[in-house]
Amino acid sequence: MGILFTRMFSSVFGNKEARILVLGLDNAGKTTILYRLQMGEVVSTIPTIGFNVETVQYNNIKFQVWDLGGQTSIRPYWRCYFPNTQAVIYVVDSSDTDRIGVAKEEFHAILEEDELKGAVVLIFANKQDLPGALDDAAVTEALELHKIKSRQWAIFKTCAVKGEGLFEGLDWLSNTLKSGSG
């Protein structure tokens, strides 16, 4: 009876839960973004070996956010977390122009995964505060986002340490998930 009431309450008042994966190469800023969204502050981070998972309540959606390590040796295990995922936040270090090609390859490999076919994609072009950072148009071109035809996606310029662009991206994500596109 309690579960039935909770579901009815959620459907009337628009509460929704969503499983979100935060993916990207190592040192892109994934963990900084997770804790900026969850706690509203920058925390000191170390490379993620495995994953961090936190709940972020935003705009009547309870996001269960999984931040997965981005090191080369960990990326093959990302697929273990794909089932039941409604959205992917792909974080790119916009200042790491040497690895933008690798970021593109990993991104397009994710898009090909059957278990993520229905997931919407939010791209954070992170580290906009650093010299030489590519803007969102350049990251769009580098990742070949124009090739994405079969799903909802958006890109936002972000600076995780300053909190810039993160909530604009979360607004887009929550609105997209609420509208049933995700």
From Swiss-Prot:
Keyword Nucleotidyltransferase among UniProt keywords: no
Domain of life: Eukaryota
Entry keyword set: ER-Golgi transport, Golgi apparatus, GTP-binding, Lipoprotein, Myristate, Nucleotide-binding, Protein transport, Transport
Outcome when changing residue 2 to A: Loss of Golgi targeting
Residues annotated as binding GTP: 24-31, 67-71, 126-129
Entry's Gene Ontology cellular component terms: Golgi stack; plasma membrane
PROSITE patterns listed in its UniProt record: ARF
InterPro entries xref list: P-loop_NTPase (IPR027417), Small_GTP-bd (IPR005225), Small_GTPase_ARF (IPR024156), Small_GTPase_ARF/SAR (IPR006689)
Presence of keyword GTP-binding: yes
Disulfide pattern: none
Record's signal peptide: none
Pfam family, one: Arf
An example Gene Ontology molecular-function term: GTP binding
Regions crossing the membrane: none
Positions where lipid (N-myristoyl glycine) attaches: 2
Compartments it resides in: Golgi apparatus
GO biological processes: protein transport; vesicle-mediated transport
Effect upon mutating residue 81 to G: Reduced interaction with GRIP, but no effect on targeting
Quaternary assembly: Interacts with GRIP; but preferentially when bound to GTP.
Job description of the protein: GTP-binding protein involved in protein trafficking; may modulate vesicle budding and uncoating within the Golgi apparatus.
Family statement: Belongs to the small GTPase superfamily. Arf family.
PANTHER family, alphabetized: ADP RIBOSYLATION FACTOR-RELATED (PTHR11711)
Protein name: ADP-ribosylation factor 3
Source organism per UniProt: Arabidopsis thaliana
